[in-house]
Amino acid sequence: MTNIRKTHPLMKIINNSLIDLPAPSNISSLWNFGSLLGACLTIQIITGLFLAMHYTADTTTAFSSVTHICRDVNYGWTIRYLHANGASLFFLCLFIHVGRGLYYGSFVLLETWNIGIMLLFSVMATAFMGYVLPWGQMSFWGATVITNLLSAIPYVGTDLVEWIWGGFSVSKPTLTRFFALHFILPFIISALTMIHLLFLHETGSNNPLGMSSNPDKIPFHPYYTTKDFLGLLLLILLLMTLTLFYPDLLGDPDNYTPANPLNTPPHIKPEWYFLFAYAILRSIPNKLGGVVALIMSILILAIMPFLQPNKQQTMMFRPLSQFLFWILVADLLTLTWIGGQPVENPFINIGQMASILYFSLMVFIMPMTCLVENKMLKW
């Protein structure tokens, strides 16, 4: 008798994706982050669901309802901090996942890469709206500053901002719609993840050598299920350490003050995972230019497949490209640091130089280096 997992219509899909899937034999731990992102998404949906049971999306009671969750709901504080710190780990895994894709040339799998960019934008939008919900000072002013950027769009900008706000300022309608969107987006992200995996399994996974792995494949289970489980344990260890010992390490103290439209905080800044993009936005004096640079800082990933003329897919045997990749990582860390600093010298100048370097590396320096390496390899 044939095994039920190979014949049952539903079990067959799971079997072909997680059990009998032929996987390259040499993929490193950097390939673990896809499954870790799936775990993060699951944790966020479950904790978010329990938070939504006690949260009220109303300007007068939102802050109090979050306080109520932390003080009066059984293990409410755990759920709240698991959700908040889970978002940070989600982005940490996302950045490593995208970095792995750049380093090993995974962007040649165009459909998978482009859906991945859509996923990145969706997760960023979800996280931004989630940060507004506790209705603290940084929630309110963060929402005001970021939504106001849309007013830079010529002709329709102001109308668009007022349409998103549901009024003439960030107020009750804004909070209500942000909660509705924050609730629905993770399910859209889940659907996009399925499509992401569908396209990945069409071509098969990339590997550190960038060569075809067809001659040497191994079944996903038990090899990579075990490996992913170890990664998951380490992720949970890190998440629980953050949640139970340092719950407020990555948060902003200003968000423990209820939102006050009459009192602007001295330094308005988003969560740490948006600081690099925020630094790029602030480094351009023109409002529209800043918005374009902000969007392009992520959208530039979409043109990466067309900017890499390298004959070798991965950077594994290309030391010049490796060197530039790590300069790019250092540059992004610098931008993250600058995004959290006040708008004054020398931070303005450092931010502008780091922004120029970021776009130069992506658009010009790295592609030119690829051509040089091709020449050196006589390809």
UniProtKB/Swiss-Prot annotation:
Gene3D superfamilies: Cytochrome Bc1 Complex, Chain C (1.20.810.10). A ubiquinone binds at H201. GO terms for molecular function: metal ion binding; ubiquinol-cytochrome-c reductase activity. It is a multi-pass membrane protein. Keywords: Electron transport, Heme, Iron, Membrane, Metal-binding, Mitochondrion, Mitochondrion inner membrane, Respiratory chain, Transmembrane, Transmembrane helix, Transport, Ubiquinone. Its main location: mitochondrion. The chain crosses the membrane at residues 33-53, 77-98, 113-133, 178-198, 226-246, 288-308, 320-340, 347-367. One of its GO terms (cellular component) is respiratory chain complex III. It is found in: Mitochondrion inner membrane. InterPro entries: Cyt_b/b6_C, Cyt_b/b6_C_sf, Cyt_b/b6_N, Cytb/b6-like_sf, Cytochrome_b, Cytochrome_b_C_euk/bac, Cytochrome_b_N_euk/bac, Di-haem_cyt_TM. CDD domains: cytochrome_b_C, Cytochrome_b_N. Binds 2 heme b groups non-covalently. PROSITE patterns: CYTB_CTER, CYTB_NTER. Heme b b566 binds at H97, H196. Heme b b562 binds at H83, H182. It comes from the Eukaryota. GO terms for biological process: mitochondrial electron transport, ubiquinol to cytochrome c. The cytochrome bc1 complex contains 11 subunits: 3 respiratory subunits (MT-CYB, CYC1 and UQCRFS1), 2 core proteins (UQCRC1 and UQCRC2) and 6 low-molecular weight proteins (UQCRH/QCR6, UQCRB/QCR7, UQCRQ/QCR8, UQCR10/QCR9, UQCR11/QCR10 and a cleavage product of UQCRFS1). This cytochrome bc1 complex then forms a dimer. Belongs to the cytochrome b family. Heme 1 (or BL or b562) is low-potential and absorbs at about 562 nm, and heme 2 (or BH or b566) is high-potential and absorbs at about 566 nm. This is Cytochrome b. It comes from Lepilemur aeeclis (Sportive lemur). The gene is MT-CYB.
